[in-house]
Amino acid sequence: MDPSMANNPELLQFLAQEKERAMVNEMVSKMTSVCWDKCITSAPGSKFSSSESSCLTHCAQRYMDMSMIIMKRFNSQ
């Protein structure tokens, strides 16, 4: 990178936003994989069953809760 660009506030903001976007995409991908493997135990039909839907909802919520706890813990250190 050109050294003069390293102090460009717009570029730094853009890079920070892209890094955050990549982290969110990675988290969603991981959550989808984990919850799918946990909750969808047979070949899915055209709709999720009520138990699959409930499991996916709870799994995603627990995953998000744990992610927030971990982020808070890292930020406090």
Curated annotation (Swiss-Prot):
<keyword id="KW-0007">Acetylation</keyword>
<keyword id="KW-0811">Translocation</keyword>
<dbReference type="InterPro" id="IPR004217">
    <property type="entry name" value="Tim10-like"/>
</dbReference>
<comment type="subunit">
    <text>Heterohexamer; composed of 3 copies of TIM8 and 3 copies of TIM13, named soluble 70 kDa complex. Associates with the TIM22 complex, whose core is composed of TIM22.</text>
</comment>
<dbReference type="GO" id="GO:0009536">
    <property type="term" value="C:plastid"/>
</dbReference>
<feature type="disulfide bond">
    <location>
        <begin position="35"/>
        <end position="59"/>
    </location>
</feature>
<dbReference type="GO" id="GO:0015031">
    <property type="term" value="P:protein transport"/>
</dbReference>
<comment type="function">
    <text>Mitochondrial intermembrane chaperone that participates in the import and insertion of some multi-pass transmembrane proteins into the mitochondrial inner membrane. Also required for the transfer of beta-barrel precursors from the TOM complex to the sorting and assembly machinery (SAM complex) of the outer membrane. Acts as a chaperone-like protein that protects the hydrophobic precursors from aggregation and guide them through the mitochondrial intermembrane space.</text>
</comment>
<keyword id="KW-0653">Protein transport</keyword>
<keyword id="KW-1015">Disulfide bond</keyword>
<feature type="short sequence motif" description="Twin CX3C motif">
    <location>
        <begin position="35"/>
        <end position="59"/>
    </location>
</feature>
<dbReference type="GO" id="GO:0005829">
    <property type="term" value="C:cytosol"/>
</dbReference>
<keyword id="KW-0862">Zinc</keyword>
<dbReference type="Pfam" id="PF02953">
    <property type="entry name" value="zf-Tim10_DDP"/>
</dbReference>
<dbReference type="GO" id="GO:0005739">
    <property type="term" value="C:mitochondrion"/>
</dbReference>
<dbReference type="InterPro" id="IPR035427">
    <property type="entry name" value="Tim10-like_dom_sf"/>
</dbReference>
<keyword id="KW-0813">Transport</keyword>
<feature type="disulfide bond">
    <location>
        <begin position="39"/>
        <end position="55"/>
    </location>
</feature>
<comment type="similarity">
    <text>Belongs to the small Tim family.</text>
</comment>
<keyword id="KW-0143">Chaperone</keyword>
<feature type="modified residue" description="N-acetylmethionine">
    <location>
        <position position="1"/>
    </location>
</feature>
<keyword id="KW-0479">Metal-binding</keyword>
<protein>
    <recommendedName>
        <fullName>Mitochondrial import inner membrane translocase subunit TIM8</fullName>
    </recommendedName>
</protein>
<dbReference type="GO" id="GO:0005758">
    <property type="term" value="C:mitochondrial intermembrane space"/>
</dbReference>
<keyword id="KW-0496">Mitochondrion</keyword>
<dbReference type="GO" id="GO:0046872">
    <property type="term" value="F:metal ion binding"/>
</dbReference>
